[in-house]
Amino acid sequence: MSEATTASEKTLMVLEAAMTHERFSEIVTAVNLPKATVHRILATLVERDFIRVADGGGHVPGPKILSLAGVAYDRVDVSTIVQPYVDDLVRRVQCTVHVGVLSGDEIIYLVRTDSDKPYRMPSRVGAAIPLHTSAIGKAILARLDDDAIERFVNRAGLPRRTARSLTTLEDLRAELADIRRDGYAFDREENVPGVVCIGTAVRDHTGHSNYGLSISSLALEHTEGQLAAMADDLNKAAADITHALGGDR
């Protein structure tokens, strides 16, 4: 490793630590570098507006880093980022895989990738579906507390999509408890008759579960137990996508 590379790595280490630690002593501990080195790097970062010294003396993100973050976020194409992980999951489970994004009280499909099965799911990219009738939606709801769930129900209602849709707050809460325990959610023909899914939530750089990943099949082809057997592959892909979107696995 060259001296230039070593210096670059030290600068990046200090910059990253300063994003999550305000106090100088905390930054030093996080990077495990000599105080003099950290002080010198911080001074350069402050001079270049990557770091700002707050009124209380703490280190906070400066205007340059905020500007770069905004530019980077504007250039993010989530569909492109997640597609390799979706393709890998499709190969593993040989089923249709969806990625959806939370939009108000609905899920919008961003990605749909089919397997080589002779049939196709009735879903389409850009379609909106209710949270309470979809595996992705219920997985996201399961990350909320009881008060937030009650506000959601009061606001959006629980309209019936099929004979199997959950239409009461009591039933929804009971299922969300199961989802929290298991780490994944089912759609038991609740959105489209004959279509079943297993899904889980995906966190992004905000730390919130704004996305979700699901595996879809026909009720005639896969039992609930067979879908549950895909949970490990599903959760691994979701963890990889979470990391790719800047979230913690």
Predicted region positions:
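A cytosolic small-molecule/anion-sensing beta-strand core signal
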Residues: 55, 103, 211
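All-alpha effector-binding/dimerization core of bacterial HTH-type transcriptional repressors
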Residues: 70-118, 143-147, 155, 172-178
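Cysteine/selenocysteine-centered motifs that mediate thiol-based redox chemistry or coordinate metal-sulfur cofactors
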Residues: 151, 156-157, 238-249
